[in-house]
Amino acid sequence: MGGGGPGRAARRGPTCLWVTLALAWGAGSRAAAGDGDGDGEPGPGDAGTPCGAEGWARAAVPPGPAFVAAASYRGPGNNDTRSNKALPILLWWSGSLFPHFPGDTERIDCPRGSCLVTRSRRAARHRRTKALIFYGTDFRAYEAPLPRLPHQTWALFHEESPMNNYLLSHPPGIRLFNYTATFRRESDYPLTLQWLPGAGYLRGPALPLAEKDAWRRRGYGPVLYMQSHCDVPSDRDRYVRELMKYIQVDSYGKCLHNRELPSERLRDTSTATTEDPEFMAFIARYKFHLALENAICNDYMTEKLWRPMHLGAVPVYRGSPAVRDWMPNNLSIILIDDFDSPQELAKYLDFLDKNGEEYMKYLEYKNLDGIKNQFLLESLERREWGVNDMTLPNYLNGFECFICDRENARVRAEQEHKKSRGKTPAPSPHIAHFQHMGCPMPTPGFGSVEDLPGEDSWKEMWLQDYWQSLDQGEALTAMIRHNESHQGRFWDYMHEIFLKRTRQH
């Protein structure tokens, strides 16, 4: 990856972008130059001060008893006999995700060892705080905790859309982290099937074809579109708008709205985003559901894909290029990108609409033993977390135990290295790589970038966001490399990158 690429030229001009940036840069520089609110760089301190911090940092560290009084539960198979005051600490930097209630600190007993977990940022510079856990949607390069301490790892939890933070789709951004839990199967703790409760969800009964045909005779279209989140990186509305020229598409959401839901209750968006029985029964009458994700990335698959399959509708899908790997059999979805144009897709949908026998082939996975994909079945069986399953941990608790076990292993390896006086090698750092997220540059939903007018809002928003995220990843990486302690200097680094880009172009 780099500063080039077809989308790079589509960024806003220097005046528009950097007027905004300069304001923030100036404000950040002034904050860095002043006394600040805890932005001073820690000094050498003394042996009794966590991480050698002094002054503001010493006051920010909780007293020892705060990490001794945490609740304790001895899980089966865990023989860790250490007291709380000897355990590694994991800090949920994104405190809203802290998966323990009530309180701010908890002891967790995982398969291979125990840790304390906390959401109190006062623990950030404690010598026993071994890992910081960040939520990808909330992570901002200009707010990252600096300086980055050498004894701490950074962990990323990001189950949501790539559009929430394109910083993570560039090598400088994703390589900031040591452990990852993302929708990609290549991540350390994959969450790929987070929207699929189990194989039984796919086997749910479909509405009889006769009822769907009766629905058609009442004037309803064969194709459903239900979206209220418009202007997204996948640019799905642009494609659907073109498709509508060739086949009837009933659109009930705010995007391309052309039909009203039959009741005020169903028109409530909160109902339309849940598996409400009335809502589900209504949309199950449609033969085809347009299932276009808001962003394109390998293994990013949401309820837009799985819900139609649960109901017995056929998804007309665009999203993960690798979606076939996860399908129950070889004929269960229709891929938009298999067709040369929306017109060709419309012809095929019309053919299936008029030929029930051919249409029903797409629902054969619902038959007894109809799920033929062993990779899918084994992946569901192998995952250690559950979806709406009280017998299994949720993926937040699972990921923190994943980190806990690896941090305990790292601590033991470091102790062994120190005890052997170098004869035993020090543990090598585990670094996330591009495939842990690695989502491509957004492209238009229909046509090419070159075909779009200069003032196209999608082009101005998403191409700029994608490439600015690369710059932000490079800026934060440089700050960490230079052991910066002032967040406000982020905009100085961004300015340097901007000047470098300007010289290159």
From Swiss-Prot:
Q: Which residues lie on this side of the membrane: Cytoplasmic?
A: 1-12
Per the record, membrane topology reads: Single-pass type II membrane protein
Cell compartment(s), UniProt: Endoplasmic reticulum membrane
- Biological process annotations from GO: fucosylation; positive regulation of protein secretion
Q: In which pathway does it act?
A: Protein modification; protein glycosylation
Q: Where is this region: Disordered?
A: 30-55
Ranges in the topological domain labelled Lumenal: 30-505
Q: Which Gene3D superfamilies match?
A: Glycosyl transferase family 10, C-terminal domain
- Belongs to which family? Belongs to the glycosyltransferase 10 family.
Question: What's this chain's function?
Answer: Protein O-fucosyltransferase that specifically catalyzes O-fucosylation of serine or threonine residues in EMI domains of target proteins. Attaches fucose through an O-glycosidic linkage. O-fucosylation of EMI domain-containing proteins may be required for facilitating protein folding and secretion.
Q: What protein am I looking at? A: GDP-fucose protein O-fucosyltransferase 4
The gene for this chain is FUT11
